[in-house]
Amino acid sequence: MSAVGENSSDPARSEAQKRKEGPSDLLGPSPKRSTEKRNREHESKYIEELAELIFANFNDIDNFNVKPDKCAILKETVKQIRQIKEQEKAAAANEDEVQKADVSSTGQSVIDKDALGPMMLEALDGFFFVVNMEGNIVFVSENVTQYLRYNQEELMNTSVYSILHVGDHAEFIKNLLPKSHVNGVPWSSENPRRNSHTFNCRMLVNPHSEAEETQDHEAQQKYETMQCFAVSEPKSIKEEGEDFQSCLICVARRVPMKERPMLPTQESFTTRQDLQGKITSLDTSLLRASMKPGWEDLVRRCIQRFHLQNDGDISFAKRHQQEVIRHGQAFSPIYRFSLSDGTIVSAHTKSKLVRSSSTNEPQLYMSLHILQREQPVCGMASDLGNAQTMGKPMNPMSSPNTAGSSCTPQGQDATISSNTSTFPSPGAQKEPGAMHRFGCPGTMSHSATMQAATPQGSGYPLKLSSPSQGSPGMLSPRHRASPGVAGSPRLPPPQFSPAGSLHSPASMCTSSTGGNGGAGANHGYTSSSLNALQALSECHGVSHGQSLGSPDRKLGSPAAHSVAVSHHLINKMSVPESFGEQNQSEQGTPGQDEGIDLPRDEKGNLGQFGNLDGSDPQSRLRDNKSHTKLLQLLTTKTEPIESTSPPPMAGGEPGCKDGGAGNGGMGSQGGNGSHATSLKEKHKILHRLLQNSSSPVDLAKLTAEATGKELCQDSAGGTAGVPELAIKQEPVSPKKKDNALLRYLLDKDDNVLKGKGIKMEPGEIKEEGGKMTGIKTEKTDGGYDRVEPSSELDDILDDLQNSQPGLFTDSRPVSLPSAVDKQSIINDILQMTGESGANMSPQQQRALQTAVSQQNFPAPRPGQPGRAPPVRSVSLDMNMPPKGAQGQYPMMRNNNPYSIMQQQGMMGNHAVMPNQPNMVNAGVMGNNGPRVGMQQDGWGAQGTVGSAASPATAAPAGQHSLPQGALHSRMVPNPATGMPMRPNSQPGPRPMLQPQMMANAQSNMDMGMAGHQFPQQQAPPNQTAPWPDSVMPIEPVPFGNQSSSMYGGSQEDVLCPPASEGPADEGALLSQLYSALKDFDGLEEIDRALGIPALVGQAQPVEQDQFPGQDPSMMMDQKPPMYGQQQYASSPANMQQAGYTPMQDATFHGLQGQMGQRPGYPMLRMQARPGLRPGGVVPNQPNTLRLQLQHRLQAQQNRQPMMNQMGGVSNMNLPLRPNVPNQGTINAQMLAQRQRELLSNHLRQRQLDQQRQQQQQQQQQRSLAMRAQGLTMPPNMAAAAAGMPGAMSNPRIPQANLQQFPYPPNYGTGLASPPPSTSPFSPGSPNLPAPQLLSHSAMHGSQMSLANQGMLGSLSGQFGAVMSPQMQHSAFQFPSSGMSQQSDGGFGGAATPQSPLMSPRMGHAQSPMMQQAQGNSSFQSSPDMNGWPQGNINTNSMFTQQSPPQFSQQANNNMYNGNGMNLNVSMAANSSNMGQMGNQMSMSSMNSGPGSGMANMGPEQQKYC
């Protein structure tokens, strides 16, 4: 114990013991001891580091006098860690509040990195670009296309200054170069600026983009103000290297309207003159930098005014030059002029003499012209009259703006036009001659103005010409509401059309004050709408506008008095400006001033239209209109005199202008002076009429129109009656006015407009009251260019509708009819243009066809004055969305395959789309003859296409139909009446549909075959005649049988096509689809309106069922809508039907109204549709909508018995075999086959269900295989594929058939697989997506069968059987009908086994092994589409080339991926010959050579679609 005690109690001893032990331990190396030592050292080291970390940051270490011990350090560490954790908890709690605990800021990102950038850009509403120090764009995001219409590739590695406005280069350099200028200066010094500096710059919008095709050169200089947020050199990038330090990283977004800086009130440009005062150079960079539209017009008018205005006997310019030479500098007094939009501009000029630096001799003098736009005020009218008179007359002729100038004074109108004004102006500029002719010529002053405006503002003329413009509702509320519009630089172009009418009230004010003196003033606002109309008719809503706008205007408005003042001046001005048109008339009467002014006004209009443009169809129209006006003036001579003031307003009519307006400045005089002048002028007018009238009959008509037609109203337009009328009408709602006017125009136009385009106008104007000018314009328009007017009309209508829905909301009911009217009017105008409907009809057809086929309409539309008036007739046709307008004809051509469907839809589904129901009901769909009848009868309500349709009906139908309008304008009216409600909501949808229709029409036109089928139908409604042949016919054939089936099952499909058409107006299409589909009642209504139930019932009871169950949704629109990219699921039907409708047509004829363009080469027509589709590959964008629609349609259709589907398939197959054209036989065969199939269908369906289950399993396997190959197969497709295996097998049999027929793959399939087709679909019926599945599986199945059978032909056969309704078209469409046939095969596969006919085929197809093998191989092979082409070739022996097989493969993939399909279809469509089908198919295959690659690409290709 002692020892223990000692040890424990004696530290010295224990220490000694330890020491003793220590040495003994240390005698040898001890791993344990060395490890402990090492650990202690490390521990000390870490503690020190920890101390540094813990205390260094908090400066706590200084608080310790001695080095903290480990314990203190650890304690502090724990403390700080706790604090950090508490802070994190608190932060997390806050974050939970903000994020609702859904996402942790530190959690894994829910958004994919790749998607984050685009999402951010979308949220910012901008695009991203990086510019290096040299100013080259190193990178730009893909969405730049949305803003600048440039593709990413176009801008990459190009100079940013090429798209920057010259005025913004310095600003951009300032933001870009600081880095390069820093030269070693620390970047940190610039951090505040670099981190985020925001600046605005103007970026050039691609002038060559399709949307701008129709714009004139001014459009080519269109800039978009972008707000750029720039970061010069983020730290993260800075560290990566020098290269990045010199980059400017920017996000550019459109400057929100509310954020847009107020445009500078003053604008300026400089000129350089020699000592004689001759301008040697002109610098407009400052003006251009202002980015105000119409700056060219501003410069032109300013210079004209400066040089032409008389100040005593010397012009400002001359006096200015003398002063400069004498004093070395000069300041001009303030002078005023008006722009084409009616904006008054005050200007003064400063000049300075420039001397030679060496000799000190004066060399030249520089002039700075400072311009100030004034807000239009009614009171300013008189002032404007004088100042503007000079500039306006000359300008109207010279520039689109000038044309618009006639209505320019109406600032209100400008507002309406402002939406489309900008691009309309370019459009107008494109065809300045036509435009100016229209705008300048007072004869159809209103019409001229409208027309001029129309070319300039595609949509505006519509407005002017349409009743809406005439109606106070449109005009007076609008113009009153937006007087500023007139002043808006942007407004001028739009002014032309809508602006004119809108601004006509202002014009009335100005006109009345200036041109009409007291009378106009009396009109004041009471007859503002009337005044607007008058102003419109005068071409210049405002007095100044009148004189400037055109002689007509001068006469009819305050401009008239100013005309007297500067009559010769105006003539001079107009000479240069009007391209001699206006000048001629004006020059003829310059000396006469007022008296001459009046005649000149009328003559000028007539002369401009008639004399100068007389040779021109447009001129002729103008002449007619002017004649009518003249006659009216003559007949209602006293009336105009009586109301001097009103005449200017209503003076849009010749009478008005002649009487009161004619005196313009004299207007204040009242009737007396006016009367004398008016008598004198009337004699001249009468003489002119006699001289210019095409025939005594014409003259008689014109006279009747002027006198018998409501002289009072006509006069009212031109005389005291006008104010009253205007006043009376004004109280009436604009809609009523418009409707009345539309009805009058439509009813009248049918009979009168055609015979006497001009004549109609006065009458219309009369009815319109305030709308005189609008009507007049319409006629004039008709007179213009049969082709151009409609195109322009459509464009304008569309533009107006889209850009100014609010404006048109009032008149929407009218506007809807207006849309129909638009078309009707266009057609009528086309008829009218020839002065007789018949005369112009061929021309119209040719021109329209040309325009449609060329897709010129966008360009022609601005340049087609004729078109503007029709739009006016349509009563502002604002219903037509700009897109529709542009795309109406161009759209026809532009639209994708869906367009074609759309067109059908429009025609067939006019219940939904005003045109469609009637088309179907009227039998337009049924056959060519009926279609015509339908257009006239069904559209009978509309009466004449453009003019007869009731305003409400016409407008709605017109909206749809105008684009298709030309196609089915007549048909549209009645459906339109049913559809008026729809047009309001349909403006968006309808435009899409229109474009689609147009696209269809285009395709059809291209095909010619389709067009020919229905040319007759269309011909009756002359308006459609021009395009109808090519456009309408396209739809008609499908409409015959397909129409009802198609529409029966695919009302939504019809709408869907618009959705598919999205590319042109995806938003509109989507909204259209949404509005159409959002309520089932609407769809049912549409179906009923289309007569789909009846058509389906009578045409193909079985087919109908099949169709509704499968075809309409799948084939019709579902496919197109459903698969924008996978066109074949969504568009396979379309593509097949469109691309190769012949095969599918026969079968589809019953099965799918749409697909059933079955008349042998209606199919081709359908091809046209696909052709459009290719054009509409972009339209595939609305795939989501389409898919939804398709699913919905398919769901409905699939719910129907598979038997029916199978029956439909069999029908289709049989017709295919006999050739689609034999529809009757096909129907019989189809019915027989269907009956047979129906008998075995139940069994088949049961078996198919079982088989399908097996197939689905197999399909799943195949899907796996396909996926492995990169061909992702959607479940639907998988299911379809499962069904397809049998079909695949079937293809062998169909294969033979395929080989037998030009479209053997499909045809053979169709024949062999009709029952299977049906039955396969029946089995598919359970699967709502079955159609899609079939589409996809058709594609893949085709490939699978290819793989299994090693032959595309076999594949085609399979698909023919399986997918006969939907895919068969595809199959038929494509040389390797693998695509469409696969669908058939899918269908046939399941159903065929039971089908006695199909049993052989089905034998192997149905064998599960076969199916599996096929499915697997098919899918596997699908990636190897190119490889398959060999097989395909075999299968498509009919298409001996591998290319067709390739195509088939492509088709399959394309169907799946939509892209290839679209391409293929478009190829087929381009072929535009059913007969060519075989060749086409092979050709398509070849065309699809790339497609094959795409097919191989499969999913990838889908992306492209």
Curated annotation (Swiss-Prot):
Annotated signal sequence range: none
Domain bHLH: 27-84
Biological process terms in GO annotation: cellular response to hormone stimulus; chordate embryonic development; granulocyte differentiation; myeloid cell differentiation; positive regulation of transcription by RNA polymerase II; primitive hemopoiesis; regulation of DNA-templated transcription; regulation of lipid metabolic process
Compartment(s) where it occurs, according to its Swiss-Prot or TrEMBL record: Nucleus
Composition bias, Gly residues: 652-673
Residues recorded as bearing Phosphoserine in the entry: 695
Source species, domain of life: Eukaryota
Segments carrying motif LXXLL motif 3: 742-746
Residue ranges constituting the PAS domain according to the UniProt record: 113-183
Record GO cellular component, one term: nucleus
Low complexity bias: start-end ranges: 629-638, 947-957, 1248-1262, 1277-1291, 1475-1499
Keywords, sorted A to Z: Activator, Biological rhythms, Developmental protein, Nucleus, Phosphoprotein, Receptor, Repeat, Transcription, Transcription regulation
Family to which this protein belongs: Belongs to the SRC/p160 nuclear receptor coactivator family.
Name of the featured protein: Nuclear receptor coactivator 2
